[in-house]
Each structure stands twice: as structure tokens, then as C-alpha cells.
A protein has these predicted regions:
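N-terminal, positively charged regions that mediate nucleic acid binding
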Residues: 1-40, 45
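Conserved phosphate/anionic-ligand binding catalytic regions in large, soluble enzymes, centered on
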Residues: 8-10, 14-19, 118-134, 235-259, ...
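Glycine-rich, mobile lid/loop segments that gate access to catalytic sites or pores
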Residues: 6, 48, 66, 73, ...
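Alpha-helical support elements that line or immediately flank enzyme active sites
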Residues: 12-31, 133-150, 269-293
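Short beta-strand elements
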Residues: 43, 124-131, 170-193, 241-259, ...
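Internal helix-turn-beta structural module
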Residues: 46, 295-297, 305-386
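A short glycine-rich, hydrophobically flanked beta-strand micro-motif that places a catalytic Asp/Glu
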Residues: 37-41, 168-174, 224-228, 294-305
């Protein structure tokens, strides 16, 4: 059966992504000096104005204005005359108590194990996914879209393409046949540029200097539609054209249109929030299942209740590609191999470190520098299942 899947990516200067980076840079500052910091901050930015709001409980007071300026400058923006404001208070004491002491501990349910001592920071369902489309075990459209924006950003920073700015986007549609990527259907690239930039030259430069290398995994054919700045002139961009807000690029952050999303954003949240930490764990589990060759595709869903340590749902879907056992058998093995309480997730993935600014652009998954991308549970899975 033939199907089409699409994914998009944005560059570091896209307004929403700048806000994500500011939020995660603030989080990193807190974690650098106090690994137990509780952070949930949102950022809104528009012409000449940046607002930070949320809850921060930490033994360290981050230099928010300094962080904002640093991120803006690193993303290619001038900070002269910028207005900044903060509306930050401490985490709700009710939430803090529920997270610090789990319901299992409060109700004396079962053994009072340290792994079950802390509760989830919120309710929700988090989804992780892996497939054998690519060496990263990620969907092909997602990998290609991020490669395009990475190359575009590198060309801007190095001056390899001149007179372009940091606001840009890419979108890739891939044709699948019987669940496998077979051809590149379309590519869309939009890149902000200077007023004097020749658009035909820009089109040629992006095709030659960006797409040629970015699309090596699945090169275009003669029928692939390639659209460069299809709106025409793209001079007014960045915060002059759009208002940025944290948490508005959820599908860019994850897997594209192929995989559902539980709805919880990542950036600006410490990993006591299962919105973030459980999404990383779900990816870790799914990737190890595919790496173990138990399935060609695997989607792992974890659901939590606020203040409760153990997940209220663990579900696995291999979409009929399972090779060893039924999906419910895989789901039953997960708690035996992976720790899925908040304490276990934080410790096994080392999520109290200041590593989050780098996650906030070019996707949270499929990047070997992150601990949830390890495939070190393959043997343990095989022992538990075979």
C-alpha cells in the first residue's frame, strides 16, 4: 500500500524555536548550580520584546536577562534596544508535595522503595517511536527535514551562502510502499534573506549547497517537487514578522506526522515533569526494541497520574511488524528492563544535568549525543523476552 508522510523542521532563528532555546537555557542555568531545581518557564517574544513567565524553585537565581541576550545573539539577532520582562514565581506547594512524596509513599502502598519515592509532576500520555527507516531509527521525513535545516544554518554561519538570515524552515514529504520509504515526493525550503539577494541565485545555492548533501539518504528523482521560497520574497522575517512562543513546534521536536503526540511540550521544563522525561524514556524503550530486531516499527505509550510514581498505562504497538512475541508481551517486559518511575527515569537517563538547550533545535530524537538514544538495553530485552 502506498502512503505519504510529511515532517518539518525549523532553523535556530525561527521565533518559536528561539523561545524554546531561551526557556531551555534558563533551565540549564538552574540545573548547572542546583540539579534539584524545579523549572516550568514559558517565553513569548515579539518585535523588540521578550517575556519570561512561569514557576522556578531553585537554590540559584538565574540571570534571566543575560540568558535572553546570549541566546538571541547566538541565534543571529541584534539585542540593542530590546525590552525584557519576567513574571516568575515558585512552584505550587501542592504540586511540589505531590512530586516530592509519591502517593505510594503517602498511602504506604507496597514496599517503600526509593525508586517509587517521587510522584509524576503531571498527568498525561507520552509517546516514543522508533523504526528502521534510517540508521538513527527515526522516520525518514524527520531525518531529512532536520538535515536540511542543519545544513542551511551551517551555510549561514560559515558565510557559504551569503546574505541569508537565521529564520528558516524545511518540509519533506516521503512516499512509502508497504511501510518502507521508497522515494522523495517533495521538498520545501524557506529562508529569510537580504533585500538585495537575487532569488534565482538563492534557489541555486540552496539546491547545490544545502540539498545535495542533506538528501543523500533519499536523493530526489526527476519527479520530486522542490520548492525554494515558494512565497517569493522573504525579507521580513524573524520577530519582525512573527511572534514566538514556547511549545509551538511539538511535531518538529518529535517525529513529524507519522506519530501521535500526547500534547505536552518539552522546553522550559525540568524532568520531574513527565511531559518531558517520559517522552525521552518512551523513545529509549522503542529504540531498543527496534535495535533488538523485535520489530521494524515500535510505538511506546506511557501514561501517568500526578503524584503517582508508577505509570497507569504502558502500551506497545509494533503495527504488525513484531517478529518475536505479541505487543502485550513486549509491554510486560518493559518494567523488568527499564525503570519507568520518575526517579528511575531521571537517574537512568541522567536528566538532572544542564543538557537541554541543545535539544531545543533540530529535534529531540535521533541524535546520538543524548542518553535516550543509547541502545544498551538490547541484551537485557533479549534475556527478558526470549
Amino acid at each position: 500500500m502506498r502512503r505519504f508522510y510529511t515532517a518539518e523542521s525549523v532553523t535556530e532563528g525561527h521565533p518559536d524555536k528561539v523561545c524554546d532555546q531561551i526557556a531551555d537555557a534558563i533551565l540549564d542555568e538552574c540545573l548547572r548550580y542546583d540539579p534539584s531545581s524545579r523549572v516550568a518557564c514559558e517565553v513569548l517574544a515579539t518585535r523588540g520584546n521578550v517575556f519570561v513567565a512561569g514557576e522556578i524553585t531553585s537554590g540559584y537565581e538565574p540571570p534571566v536577562f543575560e540568558v535572553i541576550r546570549k541566546v538571541l545573539e547566538e541565534c543571529g539577532y541584534c539585542t540593542d534596544g530590546i525590552e525584557m520582562d519576567t513574571f516568575v514565581h515558585q512552584q505550587s506547594p501542592d504540586i511540589a508535595k505531590a512530586v516530592s512524596v509519591s502517593k505510594e509513599f503517602r498511602d504506604n502502598i507496597g514496599a517503600k522503595l526509593r525508586d517509587r519515592s517521587r510522584g509524576a509532576g503531571d498527568q498525561g500520555v507520552m509517546v516514543g517511536y522508533a523504526c528502521d527507516d534510517t540508521p538513527q531509527l527515526m522516520p525518514m521525513p524527520t531525518v531529512l527535514a532536520h538535515r536540511i535545516t542543519r545544513e542551511l544554518s551551517a551555510c549561514r554561519r560559515s558565510g557559504y551562502i551569503k546574505d541569508i538570515f537565521s529564520d528558516g524552515k524545511a518540509q519533506v514529504t516521503v512516499e512509502y510502499e508497504d511501510g518502507k520509504p521508497v522515494r522523495l515526493e517533495s521538498v520545501v525550503v524557506s529562508c529569510q534573506h537580504g533585500a538585495e539577494k537575487n532569488l534565482k541565485k538563492l534557489d541555486a545555492e540552496i539546491r547545490e549547497k544545502v540539498l545535495r548533501s542533506a538528501l543523500r539518504l533519499l536523493p530526489p528523482d526527476e519527479d520530486t517537487k522542490i520548492l525554494i521560497n515558494p512565497s517569493g520574497k522573504f525579507v521580513c522575517g524573524g520577530f519582525d514578522a512573527d511572534t514566538g512562543l514556547t511549545g509551538r513546534k511539538l511535531m518538529v521536536d518529535t517525529y513529524g506526522s507519522m506519530v501521535p503526540h500526547g500534547g505536552g511540550a518539552f522546553s522550559g521544563k525540568d524532568c520531574s515533569k513527565v511531559d518531558r522525561s517520559a517522552a525521552y524514556m518512551a523513545r529509549y524503550i522503542a529504540k531498543n526494541i527496534v535495535a533488538a530486531e523485535f520489530a521494524s516499527k515500535c510505538q511506546v505509550s506511557l501514561a501517568y497520574a500526578i503524584g503517582v510514581a508508577e505509570p497507569v498505562m504502558i502500551e506497545v504497538d509494533t503495527f504488525g511488524t513484531g517478529k518475536v512475541c505479541a505487543d502485550d508481551c513486549l509491554a510486560a517486559a518493559i518494567p523488568l528492563v527499564f525503570g519507568v518511575t520518575p526517579v528511575q527515569i531521571m537517574e537512568s537517563l541522567r536528566l538532572s544535568r544542564p543538557i537541554f538547550r541543545q535539544t531545543a533545535v533540530f529535534g529531540h530524537f535521533g541524535r546520538k549525543e543524548f542518553p535516550w538514544e543509547r541502545t544498551d538495553k538490547v541484551l537485557a530485552l533479549q534475556d527478558a523476552i526470549l
